Amino acid sequence: MKSRFSTIDLRAVLAELNASLLGMRVNNVYDVDNKTYLIRLQKPDFKATLLLESGIRIHTTEFEWPKNMMPSSFAMKCRKHLKSRRLVSAKQLGVDRIVDFQFGSDEAAYHLIIELYDRGNIVLTDYEYVILNILRFRTDEADDVKFAVRERYPLDHARAAEPLLTLERLTEIVASAPKGELLKRVLNPLLPYGPALIEHCLLENGFSGNVKVDEKLETKDIEKVLVSLQKAEDYMKTTSNFSGKGYIIQKREIKPSLEADKPVEDILTYEEFHPFLFSQHSQCPYIEFESFDKAVDEFYSKIEGQKIDLKALQQEKQALKKLDNVRKDHENRLEALQQAQEIDKLKGELIEMNLQIVDRAIQVVRSALANQIDWTEIGLIVKEAQAQGDPVASAIKELKLQTNHVTMLLRNPYLLSEEEDDDVDGDVNVEKNETEPPKGKKKKQKNKQLQKPQKNKPLLVDVDLSLSAYANAKKYYDHKRYAAKKTQKTVEAAEKAFKSAEKKTKQTLKEVQTVTSIQKARKVYWFEKFLWFISSENYLIIGGRDQQQNEIIVKRYLTPGDIYVHADLHGATSCVIKNPTGEPIPPRTLTEAGTMALCYSAAWDARVITSAWWVYHHQVSKTAPTGEYLTTGSFMIRGKKNFLPPSYLMMGFSFLFKVDESCVWRHQGERKVRVQDEDMETLASCTSELISEEMEQLDGGDTSSDEDKEEHETPVEVELMTQVDQEDITLQSGRDELNEELIQEESSEDEGEYEEVRKDQDSVGEMKDEGEETLNYPDTTIDLSHLQPQRSIQKLASKEESSNSSDSKSQSRRHLSAKERREMKKKKLPSDSGDLEALEGKDKEKESTVHIETHQNTSKNVAAVQPMKRGQKSKMKKMKEKYKDQDEEDRELIMKLLGSAGSNKEEKGKKGKKGKTKDEPVKKQPQKPRGGQRVSDNIKKETPFLEVITHELQDFAVDDPHDDKEEQDLDQQGNEENLFDSLTGQPHPEDVLLFAIPICAPYTTMTNYKYKVKLTPGVQKKGKAAKTALNSFMHSKEATAREKDLFRSVKDTDLSRNIPGKVKVSAPNLLNVKRK
């Protein structure tokens, strides 16, 4: 199968690209993989996509190729330099397979150079061919050239066009070539035409396509070869302005079948592509296209699907070959047993015909042995007797005294002597081969064919010295009867074995065809690239696998009405509950999304049970309050976070089955929103199911891997608080002085807008003030008793704060100067007797890295906490001197021009005065974070207490806003409700099942699923765990044949993609399944 461009292919496609793409501007650059890139080109009323694969191909494409979620560094560099630039030229460098695309002109030009030979390369250079970026760094030691950034690309090293070979040079090449080598192989490395064109030209001039270099090539033949090369040169010149057609050459494969009367099926697969229909392909099936560029696009786009067909065809051939081998083996066994019967019968008859000779030989040898004559002397005696013409001695051919046997050559005494003497030597050799053990399989098979008995010919017969002649004859007849019985049994067993093998082969063929058809029909949905599941109330929940996916989820898929769910733990995923209807999302779905956020975090490995929280879509933003940069996957959350109850670290693994449209009606309402009574019933049934599973585990029916049994788990106690107002929480803190000051400042200032800063996923940092020690991570003891009762503390703290600040809020209050604040700090004046309780709440809030920022007079607050450092006074003095003539309006105007958030900060502060309510409680987090957050020095200086996080969708963009992929995903989102009804975990026996999708979700969502296992933190790798679960499903008594086929069709990589870390698999009767 042809896999890459030849020189003539390259010249033809370049001619077509120059005719269609020149003058178009680059819209964007994408990468399919590390070697394949897409350049989106456009001009008014026309768009095109140019596909480049390093070392392989260049062509435009009309097919939708999968693009990487985040562009590679090489694609980003190409975007930076090539975007919006016009394609000026596309030319070949010399006659090498190197293409130079020029974007832009003069000094603003950039060159993209693609190498299509060897391992290939893609190089981005400026107008002077200085390398800006390169796909594969290398050094050409032969030419002493280094291919690296800031080096100049060596254009002069490209192979220049050479004149046609002379007759003398061609004669030398043929003379020096090894004898027996194909002529086209000898010429191909020396000429730029390619093997297909050389073979075509040889055929056109009367040569065979496989003509070899040997003595038969005379001078006139070499002249004809030179004429052929001249034709090849004419073809090369034709491709410089190529505007012809394209051809895909096909290969016919015969599909094997078990049924003899069934007509033969042919499978046509793509084999090669060419800009011309060459002579060697004229008799082959082919497809003609209006342009070579379209032919290449069709070839490479369909080749992956054909690989699946070829793989299936190969598996079918192997299955039928095994069946054929079984058939041949049984035939050979039966034939060998039949021959053994005939030989034993013939030997018995020959002994009966030569009774006297056989008895005499037995007596002679017995007497010699009785007289204790040496075995070698007995052999010498026999040879002497043979020399004297003794008939008995002449019949003895070999003494096998170690086995108490004598080999005799017996013949039919009733035949004429002339007939007896024919081919005696050959028969003796045959019989010797018969007695000797064969060496190797080939000899054994040949011997079996030569062992056919020949009547009326002398035959070597082994005679037992311990038996008489009649007894020896009877022994051979007994062997013959035994072989006959064995033959009958073998025939019966062979029929059963062959039927079993045929049945197994049919099953294999059916499975291969089923898996192939499922793989082709399988549609990958847009949400499968993320972590995902469908809640028990038919809501789609998606989560990011890494920081980049978190960014994409919030940017592309967080729409009005959706809910954002997260957990304050390292590595926790950003979850989005898709809510296209905009109706309030039920608590059960919120809880399940919170479980997902926790399980895909560090809590899974640490086995920590804590709470997640959720916010509305408009509370999530990418804009920090001071205009500071938030890293990828980090957001701002403004406003109140709604905490969920603590969740167990318990996931489930199962399959969703895609049912045909005609069967969807059976499954509508399977995941409907339940009312409270139904919810309580479901909860009771869930509880009873879990209890029964635990009982089965204790009885030995439920098991996990052996490693899990040896594992020592640290118990984690969780108390669920039901009465919030009756609980008391005692908080201890080593930072009383700082917290007292914070309470005083909070009670004396307006309550500003709550803002929080959260570093998502892998960002691990610290939030600390001066004099504080870094929080240890992780805590070994976790007390969750403060999860629910925190609300009472919030109420108490807010009431006392509001009572202290009511007077100052009703009228304009005087702001404290930095000096007064420092004096207050020294005196440690408490603002109220109730501040102690608020202090405890503040201290707990500080430990969970959620800090409150008041936007008014931020600089004064900073001065109160942090005294001015060395050198700042002189710096402030210079700034006052520099900006002494600048009023507030000028400053605000300049800040807007610079894009700073300084002016917005004041506006937010003003809004905060009017909009904030009097009794808004202080927000706390229920759980200590997994680690502090590190914030830049600038943020620490200006905003001592930054809070978490959020996002406005228009504030940032990760990729091209007009990306087609995004539009397709959004289109798919519109049909989600119908799609989810067709995905069921409870297949009906009469359903038409199309394919199965593995799903990993909170275990509570799988209450009614037909197949499910429970996953908890353990030591088993997720790949092995997925196979264990699949094996359990395959051996289920309820599994139908179609469901097993669908299970088999799922790829191993898809099975374990969404399983969180190392797990323990639990299910009823799992141990019994493992033993099978």
UniProtKB/Swiss-Prot annotation:
Coiled-coil positions? 296-359, 483-514, 869-894
Q: Which UniProt keywords apply?
A: Coiled coil, Cytoplasm, Disease variant, Intellectual disability, Neuropathy, Nucleus, Phosphoprotein
Give the Basic residues compositional bias ranges.
440-449, 870-881
Q: What is this protein called?
A: Ribosome quality control complex subunit NEMF
Where in the cell does this protein reside? Cytoplasm, Cytosol; Nucleus
| Outcome after substituting residue 553 to T | In IDDSAPN; uncertain significance
* Positions of the UniProt region annotated as Disordered: 420-453, 691-715, 742-972
One Pfam family from the record: NFACT-R_1
Locate the transmembrane regions by residue number. none
Question: Ranges of Basic and acidic residues compositional bias?
Answer: 429-439, 755-768, 839-854, 937-965
Q: Name one GO biological process term.
A: rescue of stalled ribosome
Give GO terms: molecular function aspect only.
Answer: alpha-aminoacyl-tRNA binding; ribosomal large subunit binding; tRNA binding
The biased composition feature labelled Polar residues covers 777-795
Q: Which residues carry this modification: Phosphoserine?
A: 417, 747-748, 763, 831
In the record, the note on similarity to other proteins reads:
Belongs to the NEMF family.
Clinical condition linked: Intellectual developmental disorder with speech delay and axonal peripheral neuropathy: An autosomal recessive disorder characterized by mild global developmental delay, mild to moderate intellectual disability, motor impairment, unsteady or ataxic gait, and severe speech delay apparent in the first years of life. Signs of a peripheral axonal neuropathy, including progressive distal muscle weakness and atrophy of the lower limbs, foot and hand deformities, and dysarthria, are observed in most patients. Some patients may have autistic features or attention deficit-hyperactivity disorder.
The main location is cytoplasm
**GO cellular component annotations, sorted alphabetically?**
cytosol; cytosolic ribosome; nucleus; RQC complex
Comp. bias (Acidic residues): 691-710, 742-754
Complex and partners: Component of the ribosome quality control complex (RQC), composed of the E3 ubiquitin ligase LTN1, TCF25 and NEMF associated with the 60S ribosomal subunit. The complex probably also contains VCP/p97 and its ubiquitin-binding cofactors. Interacts (via its N-terminus) with XPO1.
> Where in the sequence is Phosphothreonine found?
7
